[in-house]
A protein has these predicted regions:
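Conserved catalytic/binding loops enriched for acidic/polar residues
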Residues: 169-206
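Acidic helix-start/capping segments at beta-turn-to-alpha-helix junctions
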Residues: 59-82, 173-177
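Zn2+-dependent metallopeptidase catalytic core
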Residues: 30-59
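Acidic, His- and aromatic-enriched active-site or binding-groove loops in soluble protein domains
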Residues: 76-102, 106, 184-197
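Short pre-active-site segment immediately N-terminal to the catalytic Zn-binding motif
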Residues: 32-36, 135-153
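Single conserved hydrophobic/aromatic residue that forms the stacking wall/gate
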Residues: 1-8, 12
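Active-site recognition of the HExxH zinc-binding catalytic motif
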Residues: 42-48, 103, 147, 151-166
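Active-site scaffold of zinc-dependent metalloenzymes
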Residues: 23-26, 95-144
Length: 206
């Protein structure tokens, strides 16, 4: 359901973005280390641009879970959440529950294992260490690790929206473009966050 922001308007213009009456809200587990919460929220909100292309604004929102309401539970199936799990599993996953009659996605509880940061560290130091001095450290700066967390959380949110891996997207980019600094800055190195083309390891130091 959508509502038009123009007072008294019977119909919304095709070019006007409308707000859903019930936006998708994904809460961040209060147990999540505070310094990573803004990056997880941004990973959710990064999908707003995709919904804007479909005509909706503020259709998906990441926010901190309430901590002052004793009746609110992170495990309540009426709420979607990114759940922090203090585990040595180096992974994250984005399952969802859907209504088999309509296909409507009802809720998600994204699994965010603490040790996914070790996985991110290993990926980045191997794939980007040649061109990013920030990768050649025993521990990444919070800003770098935060951006890596943002990227993975956005990927997992994509799964909760029903998207599968898009391994073909990176194949559309010619190798020479991956070494073209201006082109990559303008277009990125892969068209889809759902690909596994995580970092541009084709690029070389200038």
């Amino acid at each position: 359901e959508i509502s038009c922001s123009l007072v008294g308007s019977e119909m919304c213009k095709e070019t006007e973005l409308v707000e859903p009456k019930k936006p998708i809200v994904i809460y961040i587990d209060p147990a999540t280390p505070k310094k990573w919460v803004p990056y997880l929220i941004q990973g959710v909100n990064d999908w707003q641009k995709a919904f804007e292309k479909a005509g909706f604004k503020n259709a998906i929102i990441g926010k901190e879970a309430p901590t002052d309401d004793p009746t609110w539970s992170l495990e309540d199936a009426r709420h979607s959440a990114i759940v922090y799990k203090p585990s040595d599993i180096p992974n994250a996953s984005g399952p969802h529950v859907h209504d088999p009659r309509s296909g409507e996605i009802l809720e998600t509880h994204i699994n965010w294992y603490h040790n996914v940061m070790l996985l991110l560290y290993n990926w980045y130091i191997v794939q980007a260490g040649a061109i990013d001095p920030g990768a050649r450290k025993p521990q990444f700066d919070d800003e770098l690790m935060g951006e890596l967390i943002r990227f993975v959380s956005s990927h997992e949110v994509g799964h909760t929206l029903g998207l599968r891996h898009n391994f073909g997207s990176s194949a559309t980019v010619p190798v020479e473009k991956l070494r073209d600094k201006a082109w990559v800055e303008a277009n990125g190195h892969t068209p889809s966050i759902m690909d596994y083309a995580r970092f541009n390891y084709i690029a070389q130091p200038e």
